[in-house]
UniProtKB/Swiss-Prot annotation:
The gene is rplS. This is Large ribosomal subunit protein bL19. The keyword Ribosomal protein applies. One of its GO terms (biological process) is translation. One of its GO terms (cellular component) is cytosolic large ribosomal subunit. It comes from the Bacteria. Belongs to the bacterial ribosomal protein bL19 family. The keyword Ribosomal protein applies. Keywords: Ribonucleoprotein, Ribosomal protein. Pfam families: Ribosomal_L19.
Length: 132
C-alpha cells in the first residue's frame, strides 16, 4: 500500500463525517457554515448534484440550482469543515456521470426523473399484523 493512500485513509477515518451515499442526479440539501463578521450561521443550499470528482480527501461535488431565474453552481469539497451536513432530498434517475448538459436546458427539459429503488424497499421489514 502506498504511504500517501494510507495517510489519506487515516485522515478520512479521523474526520469521521457521516456523508450520505449520493450520485449525480440526486437533489441535495447542503447545510453550509457561513461567516458574517463575528458570527457564523448555517445556510441551506439546495440543488441538483451534477458532478462528483476526485477521490479520498480531495473529493468534491458540484451542486446546481436556479436562483431568481439564473443558474448558480457551487463546488463543495466533500470533507470540508465548512459543510455542516448533507441530506439527500430525492434520488434522480440519470445515465451520465456528469450532467453538464443541464446548463443549456430550461424548464421541463431540465427535469430529472425520480428514481424508485424497488430492491432497497424490499429490505425494510413489513409492518407487523395488528393484534386484536
Amino acid at each position: 500500500m502506498n504511504i500517501i493512500e494510507q495517510l489519506e485513509r487515516e485522515e478520512v477515518a479521523r474526520l469521521a463525517k457521516t456523508i450520505p451515499d449520493f450520485e449525480p442526479g440526486d437533489t441535495l440539501i447542503v447545510n453550509v457554515r457561513v461567516k458574517e463578521g463575528e458570527r457564523t450561521r448555517v445556510q441551506a443550499y439546495e440543488g441538483v448534484c451534477i458532478a462528483r470528482s476526485g477521490g479520498g480527501l480531495n473529493e468534491s461535488f458540484t451542486v446546481r440550482k436556479i436562483s431568481y431565474g439564473e443558474g448558480v453552481e457551487r463546488v463543495f469539497p466533500v470533507h470540508s469543515p465548512m459543510i455542516d451536513s448533507i441530506k439527500v432530498a430525492r434520488r434522480g434517475k440519470v445515465r451520465r456521470a456528469k450532467l453538464y448538459y443541464l446548463r443549456d436546458r430550461r424548464g421541463k427539459s431540465a427535469r430529472i426523473v425520480e428514481r424508485t429503488d424497488r430492491y432497497k424497499a424490499k429490505d425494510t421489514p413489513a409492518a407487523a399484523p395488528a393484534a386484536e
